[in-house]
Every structure is written in C-alpha cells, then in structure tokens.
Amino acid sequence: MIDAGRRLFVEKGYAETATPEIVAAAGVTRGALYHHFEDKKALFQAVITSEAQAVAKSIEASSAPGDGPRVALIAGASAYFAAMAQPGRTRLLLMEAPAVLGWPAVAALDAENAEVSLRHGLAALLPEAGGLLGPLTTLLSAAFDRAAIAIEAGGERRDYEKAIAALVDGLADQLRR
C-alpha cells in the first residue's frame, strides 16, 4: 500500500489522490487499507517517513569511517542531493509533506533523519560552534532543501554541491577566528 500510495501521491499529489485509487493500485480492499492506516493522511505519513528514512540511509552510507569531518560532510551533501533526485522525492518531502502534515511534523521527522547526520557532521567539523550548532544546522538544512528544489527545477547539481562546500568552509573559517 505504501508503494501504491507513493506512486499516486507523486503522480497526482495528495489532494487529488483518492483512497479508492490507492486500494485499486495496491490490489487490496478498502478494509485492508483502514486496517493498517487510520486514513489517507496516515498512509501519506507512512510514505513520507519511508522517504525521509531512505534519504538518511543514503547520507549515512556516503562516507567511510576514516573520512575527516569536512570530507564526510561534503560526501553527505552529495548523497543528500543524489537521494533527493529520486523521482518525486523532492515534491513529496519538501512540498506536499509540509502542506499536508504541517511544518512542525515535517521538522520533527527531519530532525530524526537527515538533520541528525547534518548536526553530527557540523559538530565534528565545527566544535567551536557551541550554542550556534542548532541554528547553523537549521539554516544549512534549509539551504539543502532549497538547493534540492532548485536542482529538481533544472539547476546544476554540481554548482549546488560547490556552493554548499563554500558555505561550510566559510562557516569553518569564520568560527575559527
């Protein structure tokens, strides 16, 4: 059901997807859908959670244990952009999810997934960040999301990867002064 829901949510959007379409695509009864999910929104939440976890796994797998903090952070950035290039993922996570689930729910989900890796990477690279670690994580996470949207719209991924590296290097230089 999650796969069928994902396909339809990507193709039509949440609002335009009806539960009869989902059950038909999944090859199950409506009763089966409601046995597993309270409603369409709960199914959508499961789809979004699965997508967020997939992105986080890609980021976590992107660096080797011996990589230094900067190398690991830049590899994680590249992995994030690669994971977000999965067809429909940017739309689901960055456009549909906030509209359907609300920003607090999406922020909490991100905090449990991709943002965890970003926070750890920044903490390793910028131990002098101190109390700025939280705000820096939030700001860079937003920059990553905007870059993913721009890349999906036709922007050059390589340019955004270079820009993220420049931002990270600039932060490191500034905080070490």
Walk through the language-model features, giving the residues of each.
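Amphipathic alpha-helical packing segments from all-alpha helical-bundle domains
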Residues: 53-56, 71, 75, 101-130, ...
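Amphipathic alpha-helical segments used for helix-helix packing
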Residues: 84-104, 149
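Short hydrophobic clusters on alpha-helical segments that form packing/core surfaces
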Residues: 1-9
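An amphipathic alpha-helix adjacent to DNA-recognition modules
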Residues: 2-3, 15-16, 27, 36-60, ...
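Key DNA-contact positions within bacterial/archaeal DNA-binding proteins
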Residues: 31
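Hydrophobic alpha-helical connector segments
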Residues: 46, 57-88, 136-140
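Short, structured helix-loop boundary elements
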Residues: 19, 41, 45, 49, ...
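Short helix/strand-capping hinge loops at secondary-structure junctions
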Residues: 8-21, 37
